[in-house]
Structure formats: structure tokens, C-alpha cells
Amino acid sequence: MLDNKFFRKISADVVMNYRKHIFDPAGGGSKAKQVDGKSYPSYSPNYKKSTGNLKVNGKPQHKKFKSSNAPVLTGDLLRDYGFQKYMTNGFSLGFKTEGAKVKRLAELGRVLSSERIPIPKSVAKFILLEANKYVMKELNKIKGGTFNV
């Protein structure tokens, strides 16, 4: 019942919801959470001090996130997460080029995604709600049938 049309419809919203949970771009990281829903641990005072005037690959620290614990330095990691491809039974999302950063952040206790928890519960709940709406809409198109769901 969940077809390619459904997955194409929700993929952009799933990416947006993931970014909102993990990075909180609108709030500058103030409400950002790890994939398991826990707050990010504080950075060490030395790290915070060193990032003040830091440039990575010629890019300065993202000013909006300067005072947050969200894993955003230049914004590259935030922008890297996205849709990868459609498959017959869904779609894949992930970090296209910044996977090593994600792994290193996990080693430091800042988990953005894991094998056990690939997406936050809030994103999974969003997908389930959208799937339910889509299935009901598709079933309503079929008149006079009996369904045991």
C-alpha cells in the first residue's frame, strides 16, 4: 500500500524533521538533541575557546550556533544530511560526505545516528502518521470493498 508516490511525497519532510531534531537550525542549536532524545553534552572550555576564531577549510564558525552544544561548526555537517536514493520499499537518507565526522562525534558521545537508532523517535512517529493518512486516503478511493486491517 505504501508506494513510491508516498515515499517521494514525504522524503523532504523527513529530512527537514531530522535536521530540526538533531541540529535545530531555526533556534541556533538551542533545542538540538541527539538521536536518542538526550541533550548534547557540553563542550570542554578549551574546545569552546579554540573555536571562537577558528576557520575550517577557510570557513569560519557558524555564528548562529556559537553558543550551542549542537554539532555545528561551519554548517557543512548540517547541510550534508539529506536524501540519497529511492528504493522499491522506501528511501535512504544519510550523510553524503561527512560520515567520518558522524562516526567521530559518536565516539565523543554525540550520537547523530546509530545502527540501533537510525532516526529519532519524533521522525519515526512523523513517518507513521503520514503513512497512516496515506493508507486511509488510498483505501477510501476503493468504494464498496471490505477490508480487514
How should these model regions be labeled?
Residues 1-149:
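Short, Lys/Arg-rich flexible segments
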